[in-house]
């Protein structure tokens, strides 16, 4: 668990209908306040039914699901080779990057608990779902086997004096 920093993963995505790889974070207080009140930072979501497209999202009590804090980005070569997916998370803003290119910034003026639950510790999750409400429901079984290849995951934080 940690609060604030630069978080990145260098990964090669699996491709095909029904696949749903993700690199994301949840508020460490999820057991106390439940989702979405704990906050969620989706650094990367890819769904095989939408080629060349990635999603970055923030989920809060005020904004969860496919809302204003979900950014859908077309990247022509996202299915080839390795790519760097990262987020810069500070007390003021959350910035999302793909291959060091800024694709979305969330910097609300009003930081109530409903809008900004991002001032507490979070933890990382990386997973590959098959099907599901976002990745499916149809799965093309002919695509298997597939791999979600992770080169590295890094978290950088400023030192406190």
Tell what function each PLM region has.
Residues 1-161:
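GH16 jelly-roll
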